[in-house]
Amino acid sequence: MITETDIKRFERTFDYLKQVPYDISKETLYTALELYNGYNPDNADSFKTCFDTKVYNHYISTGKIDTIEEESLSRMLHDHSIHTALKEFFKTHNKQHCIGIMGGHALQRTDYMYKKIVLLSKRLTELGFYMLSGGGPG
């Protein structure tokens, strides 16, 4: 039987899920435009406020190993939605033409290797491959 205490806990959980900076029920994979929403290449400071950075900062502020029950749930729901979106993506895209390059926020966008990865990704895309990245917060 659901008690009044349970209902209050559920309400707190739903309130928390509404305030995270990412969509816990995203139905499609993120595009570069979505991830860099708010970023203006002519204004380096705008990177601090783009979507990708906001999500990463949220991740850091709530702990790499989350100890907040609601945060743990929000991450699991988001991961599940991305997993589902990836399965949908592969229904219409040949896995043999998909390439993933994993990295992290430690590599600065001004680093020489970052530029090399961007140019490699650009060339592979021009050759008809789909570039997939991710797996990390923000």
Model-derived features with residue positions:
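Glycine-rich beta-alpha loop segments
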Residues: 7-10, 14-138
